[in-house]
Swiss-Prot record:
Zinc phosphodiesterase, which displays some tRNA 3'-processing endonuclease activity. Probably involved in tRNA maturation, by removing a 3'-trailer from precursor tRNA. It holds the Pfam family Lactamase_B_2. The lineage of its organism: Bacteria, Pseudomonadati, Pseudomonadota, Gammaproteobacteria, Pseudomonadales. Binds 2 Zn(2+) ions. Zn(2+) 2 binds at residues 66-67, 209, 268. Its cofactor is Zn(2+). Homodimer. One of its GO terms (molecular function) is zinc ion binding. This is Ribonuclease Z. Keywords: Endonuclease, Hydrolase, Metal-binding, Nuclease, tRNA processing, Zinc. InterPro entries: Metallo-B-lactamas (IPR001279), RibonucZ/Hydroxyglut_hydro (IPR036866), RNase_Z/BN (IPR013471). Zn(2+) 1 binds at residues 62, 64, 139, 209. Belongs to the RNase Z family. The keyword Hydrolase applies.
Length: 320
């Protein structure tokens, strides 16, 4: 799977960072899922190769505006782009009427079915070989993370088993490879009996705002990539004597190290953290240095519009 970050700033945008939005992209490179939709997300999409027609579902982690204010515009643009397929939108119940009323008040017509689902009672979503679950987090308001699990990735035909079962090479093999049930000599052949994954399935967790990384302990077992907010560094929290429901780079890094997370992506940075080499104020390098002091795995500080690929060897790498 791939990740592309459409917004990595906390609270407000900066000149270099938009507010929260993350795309999780299927291994095929086409279908994708949007986690959060801060204001301006549709503008970021114009600067990416992602198509609204290939969007499988939208997931909103919590009600705060920097995670959802981009929804009405994005939905309207999806309709104007010619999308016809139904679009599942999983988000807190408190936002449902806001979206409905916003579309109605602006006389916005959607040529597709908007399938609103309550996040509080959400019990999973499946599309093709991707399953999405949720995990409850800790913030000033109810907040969740989403777990993306692959099932049977990149299956290949078990030709030895086919031959042993007397199924000759030919069109039947092609149909089974495409996941079709076929009939041979009066028998129904289930494609799942003849398909094997070429690599281990991948798991990616994308979190909303959270001040208790340890809540992820169980789900982090076997995770390939953890995407977690890192709004502040410890000196900022110490001066303020409050976390405001957010995590520091050190807190997330300590958890990821203890949980043996192989790839840690930090995002949702306070606007105070400017680019490397900033003339004044805090630098994003402060976040990196604090995390590296506690974490020995592959650390990534998310950048707007940067795409990352989870390779076969399990390492998350930039797509150049």
């Amino acid at each position: 799977m791939d990740l592309q970050f459409l917004g990595t700033s906390s609270g407000v945008p900066t000149k270099a960072r938009n507010v929260s939005a993350t795309a999780v992209i299927e291994a095929t490179g086409h279908g994708w899922y949007l986690v959060d939709c801060g204001e301006g997300t549709q503008h970021q999409l114009l600067r990416s190769p992602l198509s609204m027609r290939d969007l499988r579902a939208i997931f909103i982690t919590h009600v705060h505006g920097d995670h959802c204010f981009g929804l009405p515009g994005l939905l309207a643009s999806a309709g104007m782009s010619g999308r016809k397929a139904p679009l599942p939108l999983i988000m807190p119940t408190a936002l449902h009427d806001w979206v409905r009323q916003g579309l109605a008040a602006s006389d916005t017509y959607l040529p597709f079915e908007l399938q609103l689902q309550a996040l509080e009672t959400f019990d999973g979503f499946t599309c093709g070989n991707i399953q999405v679950g949720k995990v409850e987090l800790s913030h000033r308001v109810p907040s969740y993370g989403f777990v993306f699990d692959e099932q049977d990735p990149e299956p290949r035909l078990d030709t030895a088993r086919l031959q042993a079962d007397g199924v000759p090479a030919g069109p039947l093999w092609g149909q089974l490879a495409r996941g079709m049930t076929v009939e041979h000599e009066g028998r129904q052949l289930d494609p799942q009996h003849y398909l094997q994954p070429q690599r281990p399935p991948q798991r990616i967790i994308v979190c909303g705002d959270n001040d208790r990384p340890e809540l992820l302990a169980e789900l982090a077992k076997g995770v390939d990539v953890l995407v977690h907010e890192s709004t502040f560094t410890e000196p900022v929290v110490e001066r303020a004597q409050a976390t405001f429901g957010h995590s520091t780079a050190a807190a997330v890094a300590r958890f990821a190290e203890a949980a043996q997370v192989p790839n840690l992506v930090l995002t949702h940075f306070s606007a105070r953290y400017q680019g490397a080499g900033a003339a004044r104020g805090s630098s994003i390098e402060d976040v990196r240095e604090e995390a590296l002091a506690h974490y020995r795995g592959n650390l990534v500080l998310a950048q707007d519009l940067q795409r990352y690929h989870l390779a076969r060897d399990g390492r998350l790498v930039e797509v150049l």
